[in-house]
Amino acid sequence: MAPSSPEVSRIRNFCIIAHIDHGKSTLADRLLEMTHTLDRTQMDSAQVLDDMDLERERGITIKSHAVQMKYCSVAGDDYTLNLIDTPGHVDFSYEVSRSLAACEGALLVVDATQGVEAQTIANLYLAIEAGLEIIPVINKIDLPSSDVEGVARQIIDLIGIEREEILQVSAKAGLGVAELMEAIIARVPAPADNRKQPLRALIFDSVFDPYRGAVVYLRIVDGVLRRGEKVRFFANDKIFLADEIGTMALKRQPKEVLEAGDVGYLICSIKDVKDAKVGDTVTHAEVPAEKRLAGYKDVKPMVFSGLYPVNSNEFEDLRESLEKLSLNDASLVYTPETSVALGFGFRCGFLGLLHMEIIQERLEREYDMNIITTVPNVEYRVIMTNGETVIVDNPSKMPDTTRIAHVEEPYVSMQIITLADYIGNIMKLGMERRGEYRNTDYLDTQRVNMHFEFPLAEIVFDFHDRLKSISKGYASMDYEYIGYRESDLVKLDVLLNAEPVDALSIIVHRSKAYDWGRKLCGKLKGIIPKQMYEVAIQAAIGSRIISRETISAMRKNVLAKCYGGDISRKRKLLEKQKEGKKRMKQVGRVEVPQEAFLAILNIDE
């Protein structure tokens, strides 16, 4: 490796790792302000980098962002700092790993009032694997409830560093930020000077611009990229012309050349963000690099759900909205499907539950769509008796039980960090959700890190909410996918008057099927409105009915006009009413309200 040139030696690429609400975006604002990338008057909003309304409201970062800052150190040297803001949530862990690969250092931000959380640890391990220099930062030190020394001990136990290496700041008040800037200069290594080698650049994000096409954010690892050169993408072997390249302050700043160590953007008339995959390598078309950068993988959706417009005339609008969303979100997968109960809609694949919620909320907010969402489920592998494997992401596609040899479901390894007082509650929740307990590590006298393995299907419903409520908000979780395992799973159908409602079908473990069936029938009885005829709600596994509830008919008192009189006259009127109800039952269809589909989501309440 050649020694760093003066220019490259003055570049620092770093990111910020933090749990939700630990003050990452506020700290980024202070750094932007201190380097005069922005002054206070331009900061019309807190959290400048979180530019989606949803990002601000939920206090999370959904997309990766990059911003370049110029900084003059105390010694009088000018430096270029590239801050890559990463998502912190478990659903986006692949995006995080690619953003980390574009850096040499990471600020580990921990809230002085909360301590180390599960997602902090998960992303910290990703950073250590990527070989980054870690600078621990305790934030919110000015709050009365802060426990700086206690949190410092947790960090020392976690990464084994000296107490004096841990910085203390208050991002909101701006305390300690100047010392943090100097620490970034002193401790984060400069990029390697690989300008003489063939071009290799790592894509860590892409956004869609309606006028320019996909804008690719990349870190130049080796070589030099000039405007007007032809570039090739490794993943799909497509060649594009680099129309515009440059660096990112808060707005794009065009440049003629990007060199090894630089973080910038590339616009080359890419019509679809799916061509610019996160983690892919860009090289020259004429003299390409031999090998791509390590770590690229295709992101596969983990959670599937059906999205249907409430008004079936809006199907095309929903298609357009999903198309526009997928321009900016390459991990959203969708295919059209039809349901007897709900009409035309789409089967969508998401990275996880948060990703699913965000897509739904953006459809409702940004595109004014009214949608019904079916129960989220995972992708099962069904091994048939003839040896072939069928992938099932929708319960209605489950093959006939007589042809199934066995079913496999995805499992995840999960770590839960909580106070020691709540171990019992969490163990109980783990057993309820078919979890396999592995071990517990004590982070300090109060906090523990518990390790479980769960079927993914058991945590996609409301696991996070339940975890928060039984631990009074103190527990945090993080999980990673570990593979498929064989399970005794069955398809539970719901029938209304002997007609199956496909959108209410679910795949559950046999041990839970009876309980689910009973709860679901009871829940639906309270939601489906009364009809003029009796409605039977049944839960069935195959042809076996395991639970039933009956909604009694609304009936008119046909005897009201008979004052006393002959019993045979009354009987005649009652028989006539009975015949009418019978005919109604044959031709009538029970309307299933939207609440019925949501009932499955909160069945335990």
Swiss-Prot record:
Catalyses which reaction(s): GTP + H2O = GDP + phosphate + H(+)
This enzyme's EC code(s): 3.6.5.n1
Domain tr-type G, chain residue ranges per copy: 9-192
Principal location listed in the UniProt entry: membrane
CDD domains per UniProt: EF4_II, EF4_III, LepA, lepA_C
Gene Ontology CC: plasma membrane
Gene Ontology biological-process annotations: positive regulation of translation
Keyword Membrane recorded: yes
Nucleus found in the keyword field: no
Binding site for GTP: D21, H22, G23, K24, S25, T26, N139, K140, I141, D142
PROSITE patterns attached to this UniProt entry: G_TR_2 (PS51722)
InterPro entries in the record: EF-4 (IPR006297), EFG_III/V (IPR035647), EFG_V-like (IPR000640), EFTu-like_2 (IPR004161), LepA_C_sf (IPR038363), LepA_CTD (IPR013842), LepA_IV (IPR035654), P-loop_NTPase (IPR027417)
Compartment(s) of residence: Cell inner membrane
MF terms (GO), sorted A to Z: GTP binding; GTPase activity; ribosome binding; translation elongation factor activity
Entry membrane topology: Peripheral membrane protein
Keywords, comma-separated and alphabetical: Cell inner membrane, Cell membrane, GTP-binding, Hydrolase, Membrane, Nucleotide-binding, Protein biosynthesis
Family: Belongs to the TRAFAC class translation factor GTPase superfamily. Classic translation factor GTPase family. LepA subfamily.
Function, as annotated: Required for accurate and efficient protein synthesis under certain stress conditions. May act as a fidelity factor of the translation reaction, by catalyzing a one-codon backward translocation of tRNAs on improperly translocated ribosomes. Back-translocation proceeds from a post-translocation (POST) complex to a pre-translocation (PRE) complex, thus giving elongation factor G a second chance to translocate the tRNAs correctly. Binds to ribosomes in a GTP-dependent manner.
Protein name as it appears in the record: Elongation factor 4
UniProt source species: Chlorobium luteolum (strain DSM 273 / BCRC 81028 / 2530) (Pelodictyon luteolum)
Phylogenetic lineage: Bacteria, Pseudomonadati, Chlorobiota, Chlorobiia, Chlorobiales
Gene this chain is encoded by: lepA
